[in-house]
A protein has these predicted regions:
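Acidic/polar N-terminal loop/beta-strand segments that form early-domain functional surfaces
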Residues: 10-14, 24-25, 39-41
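Divalent metal-dependent hydrolysis catalytic cores, especially in the metallo-beta-lactamase
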Residues: 1-17, 83-85
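Metal-cofactor-binding active-site regions of metalloenzymes
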Residues: 32-48, 82
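Internal catalytic-core helix/loop-beta-alpha segment
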Residues: 66-106
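Short, well-ordered beta-to-alpha junction loops that form the rim of enzyme active sites
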Residues: 13, 87-90, 153
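Hydrophobic faces of well-ordered beta-strands that scaffold small-molecule active sites
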Residues: 8-9, 36-40, 84-86, 121, ...
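Short loop/turn segments at strand-loop or loop-helix junctions that form parts
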Residues: 41, 55, 87-90
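Charged catalytic cores and adjacent phosphate/nucleic-acid-binding surfaces used
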Residues: 3-5, 17-26, 30, 44-60, ...
Length: 188
């Protein structure tokens, strides 16, 4: 809030612990007009990290257990009304969509199939280089996917260094899901 943001998406690795901490210990005590949404950064076995946002009230313990193949993750997320997209698709050496697949003789047809099923792409990651982020933006444009920006705050200095501009009427996960499904571009 002090940095001028109206809200945030908490997406820990394979866990909702950060969101639960906010919900159980912080919610309603400070900044009651600050929106906090729940997500997860899921570690797939074959395509690196995926950002997942589910409608409020949907509880899938499966999303806190790492290791599903990306295709199964996409199917489960969509079945329960959520959205999914690759985090830092060209970033981190072994934990990104493109670099993970490069080690496994990734074929353009498989990338196309996955990209058609994703709902968005993280196109700006504050902990990645401009070159890597530009490649992610090109990937999103090529497949006409909305882009998210994220701090990926594994380091204190990354907190609040990136954002995604969203309408003020997004107050819950379902609002965000509906919005992402309705647009082809999101302003960073």
């Amino acid at each position: 809030k002090e940095k001028g943001f109206g809200g945030m998406l908490v997406s820990d690795h394979n866990s909702y612990d950060g969101y639960r901490e906010w919900r159980d210990s912080i919610k309603g005590k400070n900044h009651t007009d600050f929106v906090v949404l729940k997500g997860v950064e899921y570690d797939t076995i074959d395509c690196g990290h995926m950002l997942v946002i589910m409608p409020e009230g949907v509880k899938l313990k499966l999303l806190e257990l790492r290791g599903l193949p990306a295709q199964i993750l996409i199917m489960v997320v969509h079945k329960y009304g959520g959205i999914v997209g690759p985090a830092h698709p060209y970033g981190e050496k072994y934990l990104s969509l493109i670099k993970t697949q490069a080690r496994k003789k990734f074929h353009e047809e498989r990338l196309k199939s996955l990209m058609e099923q994703f709902d968005f792409v993280e196109v700006f990651n504050a902990c990645e280089s401009e070159e890597v982020n530009e490649k992610a933006r090109k990937l999103a444009r090529k497949y006409h996917k909305p882009g998210f920006g994220g701090s990926d705050a594994h380091r204190l200095e990354c907190i609040g260094m990136a954002y995604t501009k969203l309408p003020d009427n997004i107050r819950c996960e379902s609002d965000l899901i509906k919005y992402v499904k309705s647009v082809s571009y999101i302003c960073l």
